[in-house]
Each structure stands twice: as C-alpha cells, then as structure tokens.
From Swiss-Prot:
InterPro entries: PurE_ClassI (IPR033747), PurE_dom (IPR000031), PurE_prokaryotes (IPR024694). The gene is purE. The keyword Isomerase applies. Substrate binds at S11, D14, R41. One of its GO terms (molecular function) is 5-(carboxyamino)imidazole ribonucleotide mutase activity. SUPFAM superfamilies: N5-CAIR mutase (phosphoribosylaminoimidazole carboxylase, PurE). This is N5-carboxyaminoimidazole ribonucleotide mutase. One of its GO terms (biological process) is 'de novo' IMP biosynthetic process. It comes from Aquifex aeolicus (strain VF5).
Length: 167
C-alpha cells in the first residue's frame, strides 16, 4: 500500500525523537515513509518532496527539525497537505529555538506544532487527521483512548492502595 504519511527530518540525529511518530503509525497500521530531507543542505530535495507528496498518495506530513528548524515551515509553504511540525530539542536552548521557529509561521502557511520532542503526539495527530477519511483509524483511536482510560484507572487503583497502606 502507498504511504499515507510522510515522516521527514532535517538530520539523522533527529531520528531519536522522530521514531516515536513512526512507532505510533506502526501501532495504528498506517502506511508511511521515513526520510532525511534537509531544508538547508538539500533544499532541492525538500522542494521535490513537498511538491510531489500529494501525487504520491501522501495525505499528512510530519516534519521534525531542530535549531533554526525551517523544514516544517518550508515544507508547508510548498504543499497544501497538513504539515505537523516537531521541534527537536537542542543543546543550547533545549528546543525552544526550534519551537519558536516552527510555531511562528506567517498567516496563510499553517504548521500544526506539537510540544518539543513530542513526536508521539505528531503521530497521533496524523492518525486523527486520517480518521476523518478512514473509519478504521477512527475505530483504532477509540480503542486507544479506552486503553488510556484503563491505564489511568489502574494507576489510580495502585495509588489508592499505597495511600491506604500508609505511604
């Protein structure tokens, strides 16, 4: 099956974070592709990737970048597909620089931005976007939400036992 989600990152060093999005996509059975596409080192590749994504069957792009973090915004400027930006943590500023770069897009070029390093939510957001068109993903999201509820209930149950037993 053709990939529905494109996961791109500016450098292989971003993979440490971006693989979390891929894990989510695999969990939900979403066909995807993963590539290193640098806005600064390979601008032609970035341009080609964004311009051909729709015709290749891609419906959502998840783009992770650190530092100046131009990849998500530049990708969004070249396609009308939804682009989800993942700010990658950096050594000097902890990823705040990446966050500001991705979230401060000019009017007309939206990038949905998740928390610094939170590619898990980027993957989940991509699945939610796809669930509008694909009912099987909506069903899996409902099941995922139920599992989260069960997990919280179990945590609360364990907490109550600990409190009752005198911390």
């Amino acid at each position: 099956m053709k990939p529905l989600v494109g996961v791109i990152m500016g450098s292989i060093s971003d993979w440490e974070y971006m693989k979390k999005a891929v894990e989510v996509l695999k969990e939900f059975g979403v066909p995807h592709e993963v590539k290193v596409v640098s806005a600064h080192r390979t601008p032609e590749l970035m341009y080609e990737y964004a311009k051909t994504a729709r015709e290749r069957g891609i419906e959502v792009i998840i783009a992770g970048a650190g530092g100046s973090a131009h990849l998500p915004g530049m990708t969004a400027s070249m396609t009308t597909l939804p682009v989800i930006g993942v700010p990658i943590p950096t050594k000097n500023l902890g990823g705040v620089d990446s966050l500001y770069s991705i979230v401060q897009m000019p009017a007309g070029i939206p990038v949905a931005t998740v928390a610094i390093g939170n590619a898990t939510n980027a993957g989940l957001l991509a699945v939610r976007i796809l669930s509008i068109k694909y009912p099987e993903y909506a069903k899996k999201l409902d099941e995922y939400t139920e599992k989260l509820k069960e997990k919280v209930a179990k945590m609360n149950e364990e907490l109550q036992k600990e409190v009752e037993n005198g911390i």
